[in-house]
Design a protein with these regions (language model features):
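Intrinsically disordered, low-complexity terminal regulatory regions
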Residues: 4-98, 202-203
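Well-ordered, non-membrane alpha-helical segments in soluble/globular domains
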Residues: 43-50, 107-111, 186
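Regulatory sensory and allosteric helical modules in signal-transduction proteins
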Residues: 83-145
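A short, aliphatic-rich beta-strand micro-motif
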Residues: 149-157
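Juxtadomain coupling helices with adjacent low-complexity linkers
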Residues: 163-203
């Protein structure tokens, strides 16, 4: 176990830097009780606090995290159906929640967007109404949720580098983030990915 811990520390340091490492260590160093429900709530609150801070810093209307999961099997085969659900969300006062709209969604419905994120590690859409901007099949979802700009990044496992989900911020009006703001989103997303990776492996 000690060796595994050393490997994790080395990986986290390489991927998210010393600042990210200190953050993860601080959050995970809290003693856990034998009450798994209480532990789960406390860990979820850490994530909610983090995404709330990101949303406020970037003045976004909404921030969300989606995670991949299995969702049953196809009728005549044992092949599992890959799905995703929004598992965390924070919204500005007066903005509607979308978490209930994106539960058990087949990944195949958003293949183009997910392929773009897996290849580039992010997807920037500053204006859904701009025909020159590639929206990767997300325009209908944007219209349904009143979104006019989205900045999404992939969340990658700190050990395997496999995509475990996505994090995105939405705006009701078109929005062009600066490179500094994009870098901030990517850095904080990497930090959250590290936390989620360890969190999922500890369950």
């Amino acid at each position: 176990m000690e060796l595994i811990g050393m490997v994790l520390v080395a990986v986290i340091t390489a991927l998210v830097g010393p600042a990210g490492l200190e953050y993860v260590k601080a959050k995970l160093s809290k003693s856990t009780s034998k009450d798994i429900v209480k532990d789960d709530i406390e860990r979820n609150l850490v994530i909610f606090d983090e995404i709330s801070e990101i949303r406020e810093t970037l003045n976004a209307d909404r921030i969300w995290i989606s995670q991949f999961h299995n969702g049953g099997h196809f009728l005549h085969t044992n092949k599992s159906i890959q799905k995703f659900s929004i598992t965390y969300e924070d919204v500005k006062p007066g903005i509607g929640s979308i978490i209930h709209l994106f539960t058990d969604i087949p990944l195949s419905l958003y293949s183009r967007a997910m392929n773009h994120i897996m290849e580039n590690r992010y997807l920037w859409i500053p204006d859904f109404k701009d025909e020159t901007v590639a929206t990767c099949g997300l325009k209908s979802a944007a219209e349904a949720t009143g979104t006019n700009a989205t900045y999404a990044i992939g969340l990658f496992d700190i050990v395997t580098d496999k995509c475990i989900g996505t994090m995105g911020i939405d705006y009701r009006t078109k929005k062009k983030l600066t490179q500094v703001q994009k870098d901030f989103l990517i850095e904080r997303g990497s930090r959250l990915a590290g936390y989620l990776s360890i969190y999922l492996k500890s369950k």
